[in-house]
């Protein structure tokens, strides 16, 4: 069992730590206002936390007139966080400071269908290597956040009937990693972590938004009233299996015409292969000849170079995802939709096709102020979100492993 440095703090002190984490460099006055504390109470609590080494002063904020306020942050000397982003075909692991700055990071190909034993054994090795690279040992890890591409029972840290990774069903990632680390370990769906990452970047300034990840699969992270919404069984946001064509191809879930089988990365690759082999695109035929296969990125590159067949593929994928998204926009009425995952490397034409489809199909009231854009955190959204999960939940459980 791990005991965090803050395990014996009062409720008010814990509130201050949480607020400091989410404000990412707020002032004493700002903390007092957010928490409804008097200035004298906030100053006394902050002074105590600085003295105990929990908080640190981090320079001055820009002046808005008058004396420049001092910024506060969690003391990086307390320890580090570990973020793990398990993708369907990739693995990212990072050691992060308490301000979510990346201290060390590694990314490599991985095949989630190899099963949890193979993938998580590699995760163990990479975490150890990164900690050594940072000159740290396991005792400095305050929390570990893990994202996986499937539904998760959040309380148990287990996957539940994950379509892309059936061998992981009911496997406890938490128990596996606990053999090496006493720090609390938290597991969530990968797109939920992307949503958490954006929520932290925004300092919770947006309360209702969506994050759509398009890669090997398609998923959605839902932020409702400033919190990630997971649903009754952890499967909220599994939008990849919304039907967009009843006569479409069969999905791996068993149904026909799911948007995932028609517009995700493998579908884009399949359409590109057909165009190359059918003589519709010389550019993609050349790529196929040179590489033996075509990646979604290659389609994007051909599209940006003006290849008509590539443009048609990108627009079709964007239009189908926009068709799916329009229903969700009508239902949920988000202020923003952020799109992430490997699809972002395809370029602006895909985003334009998504926007056009959503605005055409959604109610005017739902789209009047809607913004649709690529996720500003880019490829690191999942890792940052894993760090947010680790810190947020470690503070919630006071560092005691659940």
Where do the protein language model's features map onto the residues?
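ATP-binding/phosphotransfer module of carbohydrate and carboxylate kinases, centering on a glycine-rich
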Residues: 1-60, 64-140, 181, 246-247, ...
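Phosphate-binding/catalytic loop of phosphoryl-transfer enzymes
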Residues: 83-85, 98, 142-270, 385-402
């Amino acid at each position: 069992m791990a005991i965090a440095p803050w395990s014996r703090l009062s409720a008010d002190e814990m509130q201050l730590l949480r607020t400091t984490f989410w404000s990412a460099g707020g002032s004493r006055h700002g903390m007092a206002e957010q928490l409804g504390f008097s200035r004298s109470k906030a100053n006394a609590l902050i002074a105590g936390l600085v003295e105990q080494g929990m908080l640190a002063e981090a320079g001055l904020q820009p002046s808005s007139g008058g004396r420049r306020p001092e910024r506060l942050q969690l003391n990086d000397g307390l320890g580090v966080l570990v973020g793990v982003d398990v993708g369907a075909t990739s693995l990212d692991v990072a050691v992060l400071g308490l301000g979510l700055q990346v201290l060390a990071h590694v990314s490599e190909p991985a095949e989630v269908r190899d099963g949890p034993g193979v993938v998580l054994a590699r995760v163990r090795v990479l975490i150890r290597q990164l900690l050594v690279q940072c000159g740290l040992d396991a005792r400095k890890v305050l929390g570990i956040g893990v994202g996986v591409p499937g539904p998760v029972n959040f309380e148990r840290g287990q996957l539940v009937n994950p379509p892309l990774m059936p061998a992981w069903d009911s496997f406890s990632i938490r128990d596996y990693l606990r053999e090496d680390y006493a720090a609390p370990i938290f597991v969530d769906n990968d797109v939920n972590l992307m949503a958490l990452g954006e929520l932290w970047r925004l300092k919770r300034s947006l309360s209702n938004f969506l994050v759509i990840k398009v890669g090997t699969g398609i998923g959605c992270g839902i932020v409702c009233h400033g919190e990630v919404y997971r649903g009754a069984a952890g499967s909220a946001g599994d939008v990849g299996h919304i039907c967009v064509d009843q006569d479409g191809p069969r999905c791996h879930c068993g149904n026909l015409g799911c948007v995932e089988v028609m517009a995700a990365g493998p579908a884009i690759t399949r359409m590109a292969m057909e165009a190359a082999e059918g003589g519709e695109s010389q550019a993609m035929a050349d790529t196929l000849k040179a590489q033996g296969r075509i990646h979604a990125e290659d389609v994007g590159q051909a599209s940006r170079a003006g290849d008509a067949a590539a443009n048609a593929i990108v627009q079709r994928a964007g239009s189908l995802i926009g068709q799916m998204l329009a229903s969700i926009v009508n239902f949920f009425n988000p202020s923003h939709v952020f799109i992430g995952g490997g699809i972002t490397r395809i370029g602006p034409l895909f985003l334009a096709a998504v926007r056009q489809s959503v605005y055409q199909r959604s109610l005017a009231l739902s789209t009047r102020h809607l913004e649709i854009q690529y996720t500003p955190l880019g490829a690191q959204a999942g890792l940052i979100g894993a760090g947010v999960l680790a810190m947020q939940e470690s503070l919630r459980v006071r560092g005691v492993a659940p």
